[in-house]
């Protein structure tokens, strides 16, 4: 049996997406494409090809893809979570991103789809819920 390489796509091509891409690149990993209808006319964003809007995902087997949500978080704005839930309901899986420059205790619990960005410090007993963003430089002390 031949093993198919899983492709990794990031949803969104804006500012938050670029920060997450940088964190991922520092870990030595590769993102294969960007999914964002607003950037379809661009060939690439920070050197990563734009493959189209959500419909571009339909050309791949769900089992052959993993996603990163690169849509940023704004107070009172639910767009990021709506996108994730819509794609999860279709069967897609989201990866967790932890920047190599973050300090994360071995006793931290991190759920699926979480993003811990550069300069963060997560101490003993911290729990980060699904799809949360721990933004650049955040410090969460014990038992948060």
Describe each model-derived feature in a short phrase.
Residues 15-16, 75-78, 109:
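Short alpha-helical
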Residues 96-144:
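Structural signal for interior beta-strand "rungs" in well-ordered beta-sheet cores
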